[in-house]
Swiss-Prot record:
Details of cofactor binding: Binds 1 Mg(2+) ion per subunit.
Function as written in the Swiss-Prot or TrEMBL entry: Catalyzes the reversible reaction in which hydroxymethyl group from 5,10-methylenetetrahydrofolate is transferred onto alpha-ketoisovalerate to form ketopantoate.
Listed name of the protein: 3-methyl-2-oxobutanoate hydroxymethyltransferase
Keyword annotations of the record: Cytoplasm, Magnesium, Metal-binding, Pantothenate biosynthesis, Transferase
GO biological-process terms attached to the record: pantothenate biosynthetic process
Active site per the UniProt annotation: E180
Residues annotated as binding Mg(2+): D42, D81, E112
Broad class of enzyme this protein falls into: transferase
Cofactor(s) in the UniProt record: Mg(2+)
GO cellular component: cytoplasm
Organism: Legionella pneumophila (strain Corby)
Length: 262
């Protein structure tokens, strides 16, 4: 998938599928699938490193995981999150951070928020030839400011703000925007108001595409079960079953068998 395919898919009313990925083996699996694009999300801090929020993601962490994913991917378009405060100090610092992610293998970066400074930074990056994906609604890097993981845009004032933010990101030059944890009616209204495609997570079926976290949709963990996640596989249960089978076969001396020995 190429950058121009995002807008083309919206025009053709073909839904976009995006999935997070954080490591080489997972990327190799995705490379053999029909997934359109991959996000090395700052959710890696939680899903892989065990932190309670995405705030703990660093540029070094994002760079390392981007390199690993890029080595395994095939035709999928690769986007990497700019981590917490990665674009807030200065434009020079932002450009340097983005440069590291692009050199690691990302084809675009995703930036959370749509305040005036963020939109100016996005415009600067786009003018420099760097594709940027926006992100509005529940923005996990601002979780303390938002007061927790809550649905955004539930009242008319918040809804109007999100509509304005989406427009501002489009005007800044974003090629797409993620809408997270927003009522489905509002997400559809935002989607219809934009030329660029929207990618929803917890935003209903009316967006131009969907994104889920690898570990969530495959059932690799069961302690986090948000309403918007559908588990397409029970990987954790199958993994535990395989581990226990291994232990049993070792104890019963069924492994290694002759075919596993020299």
């Amino acid at each position: 998938m190429k950058i121009h395919d995002f807008k083309n898919k919206k025009q053709e009313q073909k839904k976009i599928s995006m999935l997070t990925c954080y490591d080489y083996p997972s990327a190799c699996i995705i490379a053999n699938s029909n997934i359109h694009c991959v996000l090395v999300g700052d959710s890696v801090a939680m899903a892989v490193h065990g932190h309670p929020t995405t705030i703990m993601a660093t540029i070094e962490m994002m760079e390392l995981h981007t390199q690993a994913v890029a080595r395994g991917l095939g035709k999928q378009f690769l986007i990497t999150d700019l981590p917490f405060l990665g674009h807030k100090s200065s434009q020079g610092h932002t450009v340097e951070n983005v440069k590291r992610l692009l050199q690691a293998g990302a084809q675009a970066v995703k930036i959370e928020g749509a305040d005036k400074d963020t939109c100016q930074t996005i415009s600067h990056l786009v003018n420099a030839g760097i594709p940027v994906m926006g992100h509005i609604g529940l923005t996990p890097q601002s979780i303390h400011q938002l007061g927790g993981y809550k649905v955004q845009g539930k009242n008319s004032e918040q809804a109007e703000t999100l509509l304005q933010q989406a427009d501002a990101l489009e005007q800044a030059g974003c090629f797409a925007v993620v809408i997270e944890c927003v009522p489905q009616g509002l997400a559809k209204t935002i989607t219809d108001s934009l030329v660029i495609p929207t990618i929803g997570i917890g935003a209903g079926p009316g967006t131009d595409g969907q994104v889920l976290v690898w570990h969530d949709m495959l059932g690799l963990q069961t302690s986090f079960n948000p309403k918007f996640v559908k588990k397409y596989f029970r990987a954790k249960d199958h993994f535990i079953e395989a581990l226990n089978s291994y232990v049993q076969q070792v104890q019963q001396m069924h492994f290694p068998a002759n075919e596993h020995s020299f």
